Amino acid sequence: MDKEQLASKIADPKPQDYLRARRPEQFSDSLKLHESTIDRSMLEYHFDTLNNRSQELEFEIFVRKLCEREICPNLVPQTGPTAGGDGKTDTETYPVSSQIAFFWGLNEAPESQRWAFGVSTQKDWKTKCTKDVESIMSTGRGYVRIFCVSSRFIKNSLRAQLQDDLSKKHGIKVTIYDRTWLLDKTLQPKNQHLAIDCRLPAIQCQLKLEVCG
């Protein structure tokens, strides 16, 4: 092979590049995002040591954003230096029109119902959940559902028993989520960035962009 043939061979474009130049509309210009995943044991450790780092507020913000993804999107954040406070709730729903709720695609979206949420990092989760439910009900605002989210592990039988007791006592449905629920939902690919954005896990997330097509 002489030099001219070799130079011609080297200069020839790849078939994909040639076709892309001729028919760009037939090729995707989307980007694929690769990011490192969060280790479950590391995230579990961070949930367990939130109080040591005074990250109660960051955890509350994270839980609200996670609940917006997994339970209902129309949650309003509480204001003030420490959320909750006189409002008795850490977050609650705000009313929206049925047209907006329809486009959410959720079967149980509270369009006009009032749902209240309590978030806790306390070790005595049972006392805290009971106190939160009583405080929320004392407002007389007509809440029809209460969610308590704890950063602690809770035995299933104990959680179910307290849910039933509180629901029966106050006449509304009470749901309690613990650390297992938080871990399972957070580690889903669609939710991992929430923990990173809220500065919960002390890790560096490496991003890599790749052109698809």
Language-model regions, residue ranges each:
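Mixed-charge (Asp/Glu-Lys/Arg
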Residues: M1-G213
